[in-house]
């Protein structure tokens, strides 16, 4: 695929993600939590959360919409970046920071986060492949291990704006 084609795909993806984030925020979480991602290999009822963190370089608050799964009361997200060979910025920012917040539909929380390891990671990875089947192909397309982040709510916070 040409660099020009890749640039067009990247722009379309950014435009789609921006529109989705704006809808989620504008509706105060009433819209945007459930998405039909069958056209890209996902499920009809794919769950999306918002993750809020501080940019490691900018120091600004950033909100990113991400697919998630709930595993044993922890919210699990995958730093896939579509199988790119480098980690997504949101993951690097979370790792560099201390605090993370997430919003699911109309509820938001301050949270702790961790990365599962060993046999727990294997179980969480299997679970996330069920949440969003394209993760399997994403992992196959890169040499890096796709990071998994598990967030545990600490206390409710205001929904994101």
Regions found by a protein language model. Give the residues of each.
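Short beta-strand micro-motifs in enzyme catalytic cores
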Residues: 49, 147-149
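Short beta-strand-to-coil "C-cap" segments at the C-terminal boundary of structured domains/repeats
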Residues: 151-157
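Extreme N-terminal tail/first-helix region
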Residues: 1-41, 161
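Short, structured beta-strand-loop surface elements
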Residues: 3-4, 9-11, 80-135, 141-145, ...
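Short beta-strand segments
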Residues: 45-82
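Short Pro/Gly-enriched beta-strand edge/turn motifs at strand-loop
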Residues: 31-36, 45-51, 132
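Short, charged, solvent-exposed linker or helix-capping segments at domain edges/interfaces
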Residues: 125, 160-161
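A short, polar/charged loop/turn motif at coil->beta-strand junctions and beta-hairpin connectors
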Residues: 42-45, 145
């Amino acid at each position: 695929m040409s660099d020009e084609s890749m640039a067009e795909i990247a722009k379309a993806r950014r435009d789609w993600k921006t529109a989705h984030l704006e809808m989620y925020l504008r509706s105060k979480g009433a819209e945007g939590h459930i998405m039909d991602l069958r056209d890209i290999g996902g499920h009809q009822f794919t769950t999306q959360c918002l993750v809020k963190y501080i940019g490691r370089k900018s120091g600004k608050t950033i909100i990113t919409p991400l697919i998630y799964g709930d595993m044993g009361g922890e919210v699990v997200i995958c730093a896939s970046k579509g199988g790119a060979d480098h980690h997504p910025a949101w993951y690097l920012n979370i790792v560099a920071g201390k605090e993370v917040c997430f919003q699911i539909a109309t509820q938001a929380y301050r949270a702790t986060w961790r990365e599962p390891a060993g046999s727990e990671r294997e179980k969480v990875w299997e679970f996330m492949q069920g949440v969003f089947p394209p993760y399997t192909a994403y992992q196959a397309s890169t040499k890096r291990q796709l990071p998994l982040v598990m967030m545990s709510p600490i206390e409710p916070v205001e929904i994101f704006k």
